[in-house]
Amino acid sequence: MILIVGLGNPGKQYEKTRHNIGFDVIDYMANKYNIDVNREKFKGICGEGFIENKKVILLKPLTYMNLSGESIREFVNFYKLEDDEIIVVYDDISLDIGRLRIREKGSAGGHNGIKSIIQNLGGDKFPRVKVGVGQPKDNLVNHVLGKFSKEDREHIEKVIPVVSDAIVEIVKNDAKESMNKFNGVNIE
């Protein structure tokens, strides 16, 4: 079983914000793979299904970004998942809009959601897909909690299917394969 986690914040006011790109990807994958993400469990909303003949759980933690690891830890403990059976997708301000970066492991890089996951899992050896949301011009909080401009939103809507494909490549093969195919790709 593979746990695919999209990071974000619950609530209408956070929908379609930069910080919620992980939720947007989960919604896209749920629709594409016909998985109902509507069950509340372990401080999150989730759905189970199959992608590439592998059982998956799509998860959106409802703990708010900075406590995301609490929800993930409960899933990991209940389903007895290994680190490489967790895939996390989230926003990255160090990447331009339209850029992806897949990693097998690594530090939080200043991202509080990832910091929470590392603390709760006791390690950083889980694959992750970073989605570029651009650098803030001034205030970081206003930037990540802000919505995309119309032009940037249109760009992100083209990026989300590619992010989904990168995640599926990890499910099908592994993070290295996905890195080889998708790192450095710029979606116009």
Swiss-Prot record:
Predominant cellular place of this UniProt entry's protein: cytoplasm
PANTHER family to which the protein is assigned, alphabetical: PEPTIDYL-TRNA HYDROLASE
GO cellular component: cytoplasm
Top-rank taxon: Bacteria
Residues annotated as transmembrane: none
Top-level taxonomy: Bacteria, Bacillati, Bacillota, Clostridia, Eubacteriales
Top class in the EC scheme: hydrolase
Gene that this polypeptide is encoded by: pth
Subunit structure: Monomer.
Site keyed Stabilizes the basic form of H active site to accept a proton: positions: D91
EC number: 3.1.1.29
GO biological process: protein quality control for misfolded or incompletely synthesized proteins; rescue of stalled ribosome
The reaction(s) this protein catalyses: an N-acyl-L-alpha-aminoacyl-tRNA + H2O = an N-acyl-L-amino acid + a tRNA + H(+)
Classification via CDD domains: PTH (cd00462)
Protein name: Peptidyl-tRNA hydrolase
MF (Gene Ontology): peptidyl-tRNA hydrolase activity; tRNA binding
